[in-house]
Each structure stands twice: as C-alpha cells, then as structure tokens.
Amino acid sequence: MREAVIVSAVRTPLGGFNGALAGIGATELGGKVIAEAVKRANVPAERVNEVIMGLVLPCGYGQNPAKQAAIKAGLPWQVECFTINKVCGSALKAVMLAAQAVQTGDADVVVAGGMENMSAAPYYLEKARFGYRMGPGQIQDHMVHDGLWDIVNDFHMGISNELCSEKYNISREVQDRYALASYQRALAAIAAGRFKKEILPVAIPQRKGEPKIFDTDECPRETSIEALSKMGAAFQKGGVTTAGNASVISDGAAAVVVMSRQAAEELGCEILATIGAQASYGIDMKYVLVAPIWAVPKVLAKEGLAIDQVDLFEINEAFAGSTCAVMQALELDPEKTNVNGGSVALGHPIGASGCRVLVTLIHEMIRRDSKTGVASLCLGGGEAVALVVKR
C-alpha cells in the first residue's frame, strides 16, 4: 500500500456566531482554503484528482457544494468532487477518505477538508409542500435540527454533556476551570503568533470602502473562573453545561492536500506529515461525546503505539465536560493535549472542525519538532473518528 502524505495545511480564522464571516457562504470559505492549500503545496491545479469537503448544514447551497468550492478555488471542471456529512467528524473523515484513495492508488493528489457557515444556516418549513389543514406549523432551525440535535434520543448535544458529566463524575467547577484554560491557551497562542502560519486571512467586504482583513480567531476572549461560575445552566435546571464551558457556534473552513509520497517527491513538495492509522468507533448515542475514549486506543493499536508514545493530541472540545472525561479515562497529559486551546475557546464550525484540529495539530508538531500526533473528534450518531499523523 502506498504512503499518503500531507503537503499543505491551512484554515481560515474562525468567526463567531453572526460574526465576521457570517456573510460569506460555506462554499466561498471552502473555495478560499482549497485554493490556498493547492497554492501552498505548489501543486499544479491540473494534477488535483479529487476534492472531498465536509459540510453538515448544506440547506440552500444547491448541488454538490464541494464541487462549487472547487470551482471557486479555480480548479478545472474535470476534478472529481464530493461532499461528506459525518457531522462533527466530517472534515477529518474527508482526510481519511483522501488518504485511502491515495494509499490504494485511486488518486495521486486529493484536497480534503471541511467548510461551514453556521450563522447562515436557514430556517425551513417542513410541511410547506403539502400544506397545513389546521393547527400551528413549526419552523425548523437547520443549524439546531440537523447539526446539534440527537434525533434518536430527541435532545440537544448539551444533554449528552450532562449525561457524560454525571457518568464520569465531572463537576461544574472542573469544567469551568478546563474552559478557562482553553481560553487562556488560545489567547496565549494568538499573542505569540502561533496560529499565523496555519491561517489564511479573509477579506470581508464592507458597505463602504476597502474590504476589512480578518486574520485572527474571533471567539477567544478574556474571562475568569468567577465569570464562568456565574453563568446559568444552558440545557437543564441545575445542570453543569453553560455557554462558557461549551464550544462556540462559529464559521470557518480548513483544507489539506494529501498526496502519494512518490508524487510529492516528483513535484518537489515539502512533506509536512505522513498519514498513519485511522479509526472510527460507535457507542450508545446518549454518551456520544466520550466516544474518543474508544476511538483513540483503537487507532493507536492499529499504529502500534501506546498513549505515552504520542507527542501531541488534539481532542475536539465539543464541551469542556466531555473533553475532561476523555482525558481522564485515557489518562492524557494536559501538557500534550489541546496545547493551544480548543473549540471551547476557538469555535466549532461543525463541518470544518475535523480538519481544523488536524491543521492546528500539524503546525504545532512542526513548531515543536514532534514526531507523532493524534486528532480525534466525537460526532453525532454516537461515534468518534481518530487519525494518527507522523513526522
């Protein structure tokens, strides 16, 4: 089987809910990171075989959003494209599929990642096609219904955090302190310029004058344990989940270029990382947020590694509580895990986050000269995805 390598890794800064990127559609954001990923890889556009992009909230975008993004990126019409929805794992699964295509010889060059504009997700009227004979009609929120809601158990993902927190005995105080650390780490990373190499600045059109350049993640903010502890429970009375210790609804996109090592060497591309083992795992949907507890050991077993042999982990912070539960169960070193903050502070554009955490992981591995990293995310449906990358 051929070796799959990553030769570029880029993301937009993440915009807050109804924030800086709210007016730029997901396919536009996707087009920007695809174009930049190909440019940074120094790969001719005609050498790209396929584009795979995650998108969880596609309502209103039209046919094959990945193709739209590829065309906006300036790629040729003949490039094959498809859009994947594996909820929060979409963009990492896109990279996993790209690696499989390269490893099996089906492709030499694949652009993979994800894109999401949660701010722009529309509302829709489910029975409008057939009419309402009598009684009230309900307008659905595409973002909540299709992105954040467990249809089987009929509850918001925040309720899963309540259940996981109870099961793993993660207190409100522990969650708030973890959230504070995530914000502090993200702000420190921004101040030190650690995200600059991975971020593609985005020009935001203004009503008058020149576009405004958006180049810094919008969501990280100064806070304190006192401020976090005063926030009310968001999902159930007396609950432990708040707006302060949950991931931030946000907008953004990320992409990587995956190639065969042979093609990368032929074109003189700089190899940023080699793709190792990949894994998925499914559990009881009620406890979806802690599924990485099983996905991470599975991927490490496939790679022949122990937890303590991994230099860096990126575990997506859907909620502080569930992240604490995963770290507790796997005995992860906090100094190796989400070292620049995570989705609690940076934001969680659900269709893009899988690649966002990978992009951040790769750039931090380069900065530290780390040899092995693992990215993992829980995802709606009671599953998690995990990927090993090596340098």
Task: Write out the residue ranges for each language-model feature.
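Condensing-enzyme catalytic core mediating Claisen C-C bond formation in acyl metabolism
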Residues: 1-26, 139, 224-290, 294, ...
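Conserved active-site "lid/cap" helical segment
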Residues: 1-61, 65-73, 77-80, 160-172, ...
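N-terminal extracellular/periplasmic Venus flytrap/periplasmic-binding protein-like
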Residues: 11-12, 23-32, 40, 174-266, ...
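Conserved catalytic cysteine-centered active-site region
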Residues: 55-109, 152-156, 222-248, 329-356, ...
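Active-site-proximal alpha-helical scaffold in enzymes
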Residues: 84-116, 165-194, 255-262, 349-370, ...
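Flexible glycine-/small-residue-enriched beta->alpha junction loops
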Residues: 109-163
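Active-site pocket-lining segment
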Residues: 160-162, 195-198, 206, 276-345
